[in-house]
Amino acid sequence: MNLLSFYISEKQHHADMPLYEWLLEEAKSLGVHGGSAFRAIAGFGRHGHMHEETFFELAGELAVKVEFILDDALADRLLEKIRGHNMNVFYLKQTVEAGVV
């Protein structure tokens, strides 16, 4: 199993919708059983600029993390689909153990 996480800006869009929504829809269409989007309350990126949830941050500068737990085949299919759209999306793919106790 893999944890596939995408780190995007809340202002990023694709196909006339927020990118986090598009990622969730595309994963669902491939048969991924679930996914979640999480909005950051604060952070900084590669340029070192601090972003926080304040009145002045209403321009959509905060990060959104979209993640899925899926097998290798689905992870590869989702990544390939995203590559086919020539997007600039940072991701992490980690091997994880998942279960229910």
Show the residue positions of the predicted features.
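Positively charged, small/polar-rich N-terminal and surface patches that mediate targeting and assembly
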Residues: M1-V101
